[in-house]
Amino acid sequence: MSILDNIEPPLIEKEYGALHPINQTKKYLLQLLSKIGFEEVHGPEIETEEFNFDMLNIKKTHPARQMHDTFYAENKEYVLRTHTSPVQIRSMLESQPPIAFTSAGKVYRKDDDATHLPMFHQVEGIYVDKNVTFANLKDLIHQILHDLFGSDVEIRFRPSYFPFTEPSAEVDILSENGKWLEILGCGIVNPVVLENCHIDPNKYSGLAFGLGVERIAMLKYGVNDIREFYKSNMDFLSQFK
């Protein structure tokens, strides 16, 4: 018998991978919206100005179209999409109400600090049918936020302005330290946007909302700096397995 016969190989602990916390959050949101009845649709990250701005009633003079806010291609006709709304526009052009679409993915803006990145993720939704009202929108937003943060979370709606919705609102939740935190934007779809998609605004109305996935993840997991999600720090990321 060889002395090697009594030697057992060392036990090696297996390390299993897991979804990144941003992908976990995005997946959760999409599953939630799917249960409500939203269909996920997809579109390009490199968009035309027409679909990224014009179809959404964002005028040529709007600040969002300036070079210091948007990443333009060399020929200036294409941009890295600044939101996922163009995906819904493309899908609406191929459909007729009632429709309920959600789109999720990377979007790009010229921001970079503790709460903003030049690339981040959005989940947006749009619902168009007869007699859709702001009351329907409020009910839907409460349903989403109660699922995310618990049934006792305090929610407030503040009047706001977006070119593609009218009326528009920003929605805040009350944090544990007593501060209101902006969580999403929403509104009733502007009739101009419906007309651009060949939908009669005299017959149909719609609601729309958009959430920043990183913002949701920061609040849900108590992360103060958005950049932590992308530093490849395994000690940090292993918390989310």
Protein language model annotation of sequence segments:
Residues M1-K241:
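TRNA-recognition modules of translation machinery and tRNA-sensing kinases, especially anticodon-binding
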